[in-house]
Regions:
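Residues in the recognition helix of alpha-helical DNA-binding motifs
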Residues: 55-56, 65, 191
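Amphipathic alpha-helical segments used for helix-helix packing
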Residues: 67, 78-80, 103-129, 175-176
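Amphipathic alpha-helical packing segments from all-alpha helical-bundle domains
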Residues: 101-105, 112, 122-152, 158-163, ...
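Key DNA-contact positions within bacterial/archaeal DNA-binding proteins
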Residues: 50
Length: 210
């Protein structure tokens, strides 16, 4: 075995152990521990505390790195390829279904990110805040493009209607329905579908629902 092979083996082991650490953090997020300590992560990962600190510099870095890891894993779920396709009813249904799937995939990590930004400001928390802002902006753009035909009918009220629809369908709102509100997935889906119909439907469509 050459020196190069030895170095490659060490690098691969380090990369594997780093992922073990970050995946342990994600497991703790899912269990409700939104700000796990390095000691807790060490116990969960089966690695020593010293090993954990080889891969992250502090608690903030631990949480931020785990969030980044999760976003890499679920990145494709942020892509909504059916933008603008189908009738209004079909577009509402596909949009709500996509948002509920996205929530299911990212909810624990999103809660941890939210919790981290509410603590004292640190370089890591500011990075998380910027990432959240970018993700929310991307979801807002998807909404605007998907329902562009409807939004153009509202004239000067279009921005206000978009803001209301955006607030209704963001991940944090869905999380409120399912966690704090105690609604089922089916009830949440119905609420989002009804809300989007009321906000974005044509006058004729809204009148039919009265």
């Amino acid at each position: 075995m050459t020196e190069h092979d030895v170095l490659d083996g060490r690098t691969a082991r380090r990369d594997r152990n780093r992922l073990v650490v970050l995946d342990a953090v994600l497991q703790l997020f899912a269990e409700g521990d939104l700000s796990p300590t390095p000691e807790t992560v060490a116990r969960r990962s089966g690695l020593s505390l010293r090993s954990v600190y080889r891969y992250v510099s502090d608690r903030d870095d631990l949480v931020r790195s785990a969030i980044d890891r999760h976003l890499e894993m679920v990145g494709p779920m942020f892509v909504f390829e059916a933008i603008g396709e189908g009738t209004f009813d079909e577009r509402v249904a596909t949009f709500v279904a996509a948002r509920l799937r996205l929530h299911k995939a990212i909810a624990p990590t999103a809660r941890a990110a939210q919790a981290r930004t509410r603590l004292r400001a640190t370089p890591a928390s500011e990075i998380i805040r910027e990432s959240l802002h970018a993700r929310r902006g991307m979801l807002r753009v998807q909404l605007a493009r998907h329902f562009e035909a409807e939004l153009t009918t509202f004239g000067t009220q279009a921005d206000a209607i978009l803001a209301a629809a955006d607030g209704l369908t963001q991940i944090e709102t869905i999380d409120w329905f399912l966690v704090d509100g105690g609604y089922t997935v089916e009830q949440t889906s119905e609420a989002l579908v009804t809300g989007l119909h009321r906000l974005l439907g044509t006058v004729a469509t809204r009148d039919q629902g009265k």
